[in-house]
Amino acid sequence: MKDLTMLLDELKDMSFFNKGDICLIGCSTSEVIGEKIGTVGSMEVAETIFNALDVVSKETGVTFAFQGCEHINRAITIEKSQYNPLTMEEVSVVPDVHAGGSLATYAFQHMKDPIVVEHITVPCGIDIGQTLIGMHIKHVCVPVRTSVKQVGQAIVTIATSRPKKIGGERAKYK
């Protein structure tokens, strides 16, 4: 997928991925192949995307988390090594192509020691196909603009975050 490679290269060039961070991926493989979200899914597309992200992880030190679909309440598949019981709650579900989505399913099958958590708060994310990842992005969510607007036929939305600016009229900010 040339557009996926171009997108990931552009994000690497702008230092979007940071060592030790978790980046959330939401993806509708149905949308990537030009179909309505949640209708057909593709494990082949999921494999391609997962493998491309794995390369980025090895190059940059970022870890990826994978959002499931609404049928599992957009639960997140992560490596157990990333699990923090103080801020995350593990749930009993295994993503499936028809209840979780192809990419979350593929990730669960190919991660070293996967678990699924109900909610996560991460500093950045990539949404391929309008899967609504915003609920898991740290406040304050900031859009990231790239020259790549689609992966396959799916619209891509990218977000990072910044600290909240709090205070009143006397407050000063960096």
UniProtKB/Swiss-Prot annotation:
SS bond partners: none
Coiled-coil spans in chain: none
InterPro entries recorded: Antibiotic_NAT-like (IPR028345), DUF436 (IPR006340)
Superkingdom: Bacteria
Family named by the database record: Belongs to the UPF0340 family.
Name of the molecule in the record: UPF0340 protein SaurJH9_2150
